[in-house]
């Protein structure tokens, strides 16, 4: 955990970047920073595995590409449902905007963020807690820690932290059920990418340029305001409902069993 402190500090620095007042070549700077964070995360993981003589699978690091794609579709669904509800009830109006090349940068930027945060939150923290505590306690504590990672973000709200914590619990549950962070990475990536690069909403307090330009027609309590969809009471309710459904009807929704993972794993 101590070894990850520099990684988390850099992560906070990156998300505190003012994306509307970008200096020259900001994408190169940000991608390079994220790449450095990713390398640092992989290095700490290597030290952990090597030093403690563990397998990557003990940290839920098992590449399962089908699960990854399912997770991406799952994360996309969250934002589509949010868009449909807010558009239908006149809460947010989504208008097409001019296409920006920023879209391509965000594609890789949010992918790296998803990989880094899932390795740290679910791969390391959840797996460590799982060794000593029950599934519920491990999920609860790791998801709260995941939420607190975003405490220093701009425009943070109680609802925003609650939604992020609930989503962390969901991704942790998915990780325990599949034995891999693959689906959680896909979900995490789509959650941020679709929210920011497509819908044009802020992502955890950071301004984004998307394919759509959202116009807020209601209070921040419903729109999420400057924090993004996570700051919306609507998204919090959606996340909690989906979490309950996934817990109750896992096999019917995903058709994935823990015992099947050895057949799908590609290490």
Annotated model-derived regions:
Residues 116-141, 145, 173-180:
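Membrane-interface helix/loop boundary segments of multi-pass membrane proteins
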Residues 31, 68-73, 103-107, 136-141, ...:
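Hydrophobic alpha-helical transmembrane segments
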Residues 1-8, 38-46, 76-84, 235-250:
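Hydrophobic core of alpha-helical transmembrane segments in multi-pass integral membrane proteins
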Residues 8-31, 49-119, 126-131, 259, ...:
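Juxtamembrane helix-loop-helix connectors linking adjacent transmembrane helices
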Residues 79-80, 110, 114, 134-151, ...:
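Small-polar-interrupted transmembrane alpha-helices in polytopic inner-membrane proteins
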Residues 5-9, 160-220:
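Functionally important transmembrane alpha-helices
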Residues 32-43, 103-108, 116, 120, ...:
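Membrane-embedded alpha-helical segments of multi-pass membrane proteins
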Residues 194-267:
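C-terminal membrane module of polytopic membrane proteins
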């Amino acid at each position: 955990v101590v070894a990850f402190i520099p990684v988390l500090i850099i992560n906070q620095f990156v998300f505190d970047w003012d994306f509307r007042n970008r200096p020259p070549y900001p994408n190169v700077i940000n991608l390079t920073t994220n790449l450095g964070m990713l390398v640092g995360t992989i290095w700490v993981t290597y030290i952990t595995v090597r030093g403690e003589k563990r397998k990557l699978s003990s940290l839920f690091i098992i590449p399962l590409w089908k699960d990854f794609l399912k997770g991406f579709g799952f994360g996309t669904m969250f934002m589509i449902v949010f868009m449909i509800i807010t558009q239908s009830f006149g809460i947010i109006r989504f208008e097409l905007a001019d296409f920006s090349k920023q879209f391509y940068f965000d594609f890789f930027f949010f992918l790296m963020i998803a990989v880094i945060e899932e390795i740290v939150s679910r791969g390391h923290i959840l797996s460590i807690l799982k060794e000593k505590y029950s599934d519920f306690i491990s999920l609860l504590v790791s998801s709260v820690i995941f939420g607190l990672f975003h405490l220093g973000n701009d425009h943070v709200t109680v609802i925003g932290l609650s939604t992020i914590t609930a989503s962390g619990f969901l991704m942790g549950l998915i990780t325990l059920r599949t034995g891999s962070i693959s689906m959680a990475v896909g979900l995490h990536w789509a959650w941020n990418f679709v929210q920011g690069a497509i819908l044009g909403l802020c992502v955890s307090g950071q301004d984004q340029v998307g394919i759509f330009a959202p116009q807020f027609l209601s209070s921040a309590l419903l729109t999420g305001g400057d924090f993004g969809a996570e700051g919306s009471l609507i998204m919090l309710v959606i996340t909690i409902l989906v979490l309950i459904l996934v817990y109750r009807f896992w096999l019917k929704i995903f058709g994935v069993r823990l015992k099947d993972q050895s057949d799908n794993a590609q290490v």
